[in-house]
Amino acid sequence: MDIPFEEGVLSPSAADMRPEPPNSLDLNDTHPRRIKLTAPNINLSLDQSEGSILSDDNLDSPDEIDINVDELDTPDEADSFEYAGHEDPTANKDSGQESESIPEYTAEEEREDNRLWRTVVIGEQEQRIDMKVIEPYRRVISHGGYYGDGLNAIIVFAACFLPDSSRADYHYVMENLFLYVISTLELMVAEDYMIVYLNGATPRRRMPGLGWMKKCYQMIDRRLRKNLKSFIIVHPSWFIRTILAATRPFISSKFSSKIKYVNSLSELSGLIPMDCIHIPESIIKLDEELREASEAAKTSCLYNDPEMSSMEKDIDLKLKEKP
């Protein structure tokens, strides 16, 4: 639609000849004139010829570019919109992978974690025990009932359940097992108590070292040291006797006087009640073998005794042949 102009249509060259705009409004003019300008013809070609948008003639110099940021119209929040067109499908995929990389910590997993770790206080210091790594060795310490009057506990320590020293994580296992033994001992003992150390059926590679036993003794609470009435070692070997002899310099004479050696389970039953004491099968088998070997040795000594008459030997043989 053609729009008539009162002064005529201005050409692009005439726009440069416009008079300067007034600095004040003429409020006395009752019929102000409105001038409308038409856009110049623009060549949309990509070459830099005259009239093209890439031409240097259309580029404003830095002095001519004067933009007042405060006077620019910005869209309101209501006028804004989100572009939901061609989205990158990999963006959603990456965000989904990031959300899946951190799994939710469920209540069941929290309970399971509490079962795998136990927090104890030993020597006024809080310690954490890796219960998973010592699970196969928890039978090393057990409650064997009571003796005498009151709550005099019998604590059974079975060395045959100790870990093998050939394990790659042997020191880590023994460290956690040490904390478990000490904390369990404090829970089991209320008054006086005794320790029954089952040394039999334990290969050399499973025997605890001198440093480990020394640390156990030093970490035991003073109350537990005082209330310990007896330390019975069943089936003692020359190795355990040597270990205890080496520990005498740093243990008290009172503790040394509490150590007793017992060579058989029958001898142990004459000292304490055996009803609640769990004896491993390997130790029971060893005890039978030692008893048979002892009887055979006695018989051999009797037959080799020159003072024993032939009549006494015949009587002894007849007694053994009777059912």
Swiss-Prot record:
Q: Where in the cell is it found?
A: Cytoplasm
| Domain CRAL-TRIO: start-end pairs | 130-291
Pfam families under this entry? BNIP2, CRAL_TRIO_2
Where is it found, in Gene Ontology cellular component terms? Answer: cytoplasm
Disulfide partners:
none
Q: Work out whether the entry's keyword set contains Ribonucleoprotein.
A: no
Keywords noted in UniProt: Apoptosis, Cytoplasm
Question: Biological process (GO) annotations?
Answer: apoptotic process
> SUPFAM superfamilies this protein is in?
CRAL/TRIO domain (SSF52087)
What is the protein's known function? Answer: May play an important role in regulating differentiation, survival and aggressiveness of the tumor cells.
- What is the name attached to this protein's record? Protein prune homolog 2
What lineage does the source organism belong to?
Answer: Eukaryota, Metazoa, Chordata, Craniata, Vertebrata
